[in-house]
Amino acid sequence: MTEFVPLTWHDTLYLAPELILAAMFLILIVTDLILPGRTNRAIIGWLSLAGLLLSLAAVIWRMIDMNPSGVSAAEAAEAGKAISLLGASYRVDDYGNLLKIIFLIGTSLVVLLGLGSTQKDDAVTDKAEFYYLLLPAAAGAMIMASSGNLVTLYIGLELLSITTYVLVGLRKRSSLSAEAAFKYVVTGGIASAFVLFGMSYLYGVTGSVSLADFPTALPQAFTDYKALVYVGFFFLIAGFGIKIAAAPFHIWAADVYQGAPTPVSAFLAVIAKGAALAAVFRFLYSSAFFLTGGPGKQAGDDVFFALLVIAAAAMIAGTVSALRQKQVKRLLALSGVANAGYLLVPIAISVTIIHSNNFSEFVFYLVAYLLMNVGAFAVVTVIARAAGHEELKGFSGLYYRAPWTAAAMLIFILSFSGLPVTAGFFGKLFILLGAASVKAYWLVAIMVVSTVISYYFYFGIIRQMFMRSNGEEEDRIHVPAVTGTVIWICAAATVALGVLPGPLMKWIDAVFTIQADLFVR
């Protein structure tokens, strides 16, 4: 069993990104209490953004330190070793670092999106708690990405969950928000119970909560406790399936996304979903993956096949359910169900000699998904302000009233659709080629068919923007500078990755290694 090693002051330097967020969270609570009631709470938003960027800088600094240039291969390997803290319960490695960068950038864009909104839009972005609650939520996502045992993983999951429960229900005067908060708390509680129940079974059969012990303990336990191992894994899959809104566990998503403030919906769509996927990725490759080569081979194969089935179901259910949607946030929620399926594919096809770069595919598409989702939700805030609602008809004649915003939304729609030249095209292509390389042709067929079907509702938005008129073409839509900045950061990055995907993929492959960064030893 892994021995517990006390945390030293030197070790806290490795935890700087998380500690920065924790310290800023406490500072902002006190600041909010002492500020006069009439003071604009946007200052809390800007301070939250500063804390997120400072944490991001700390993560990047750690990555540079772990991946030095101009040194020998032996020195580079030594510098790149994962750093285990608190008895391997928390890891600092390039797997976690890459995902933390995504989570922090995504949360920063959500804060900017909130700063670009007004009280009229969501009735929450003038409240300080909207901004500072995003900090512990981001910290929870980061903890999930770096967890080295089941306890740490669950703590990160609950930190993320509890803060998002509050964020979803911040619009106290909105019946939709109250309904969304209730549904999210109930389904989130069920998901947490499933995850904890599954963890308890695996702890019971292995005698350890450390992921470092699972590669040896789990195959041994499988011989005597085959049924319990199956139960543990499938409760965990069901629990995380609810968290990522993958079919058939996705029923809550549309109502919650519709009722939540738009920036919160963007956070749930990207950071909350990405954190759960990151946890599944690391957990399965520290447990079920090691069953595939021993007496538990059938169980390991069954776990990964179950993920493939869920991925396929998510792609089909999300796409079909979105066909008749007229409410844009509900449409984006159901689109997110389908995209959860795409993101599960690199995890579920497993690492083989033939196909070993599934993490690169996962990260690339997660980045593409972040950009097109946050950008699309930013456009929704603009439309909702102008039209007074979030229906699809609000996009009518957008090209004539805000041509640059319409152009940006066109980029996001093309990326969602997986068409050139956007990040979504290469993201889906890399995942499709990965599935084809392991001969999962049935899954390739489902990916292609679901993508083609999705053109109907994605192009419906394009048709509204460019081919429909609401008779108010002379009424120009005002786009706040901060919101416009978010939209064009996302649009420019989406096109850049669609034109030059190679540099990002090569960089991920250069800093990430399966043995050192994914497997917990």
Swiss-Prot record:
Subunit structure of this chain's protein: NDH-1 is composed of 14 different subunits. Subunits NuoA, H, J, K, L, M, N constitute the membrane sector of the complex.
Catalyzed chemical reaction(s): a quinone + NADH + 5 H(+)(in) = a quinol + NAD(+) + 4 H(+)(out)
Lineage: superkingdom: Bacteria
Compartments, record wording: Cell membrane
Record-level GO BP terms: ATP synthesis coupled electron transport
UniProt KW keywords: Cell membrane, Membrane, NAD, Quinone, Translocase, Transmembrane, Transmembrane helix, Transport
GO terms, molecular function: NADH dehydrogenase (ubiquinone) activity; NADH:ubiquinone reductase (non-electrogenic) activity; quinone binding
Organism listed in the record: Paenibacillus sp. (strain JDR-2)
Annotated InterPro entries: NADH-Q_OxRdtase_suN/2, ND/Mrp_TM
HAMAP family linked to this entry: NDH1_NuoN_1
Name by which UniProt lists this protein: NADH-quinone oxidoreductase subunit N
EC number: 7.1.1.-
Family: Belongs to the complex I subunit 2 family.
Membrane topology term: Multi-pass membrane protein
Pfam families tied to this protein: Proton_antipo_M
One GO location term (cellular component): plasma membrane
Sequence intervals crossing the membrane: 15-35, 43-63, 98-118, 128-148, 150-170, 185-205, 227-247, 261-281, 303-323, 331-351, 363-383, 406-426, 442-462, 485-505
Function: NDH-1 shuttles electrons from NADH, via FMN and iron-sulfur (Fe-S) centers, to quinones in the respiratory chain. The immediate electron acceptor for the enzyme in this species is believed to be a menaquinone. Couples the redox reaction to proton translocation (for every two electrons transferred, four hydrogen ions are translocated across the cytoplasmic membrane), and thus conserves the redox energy in a proton gradient.
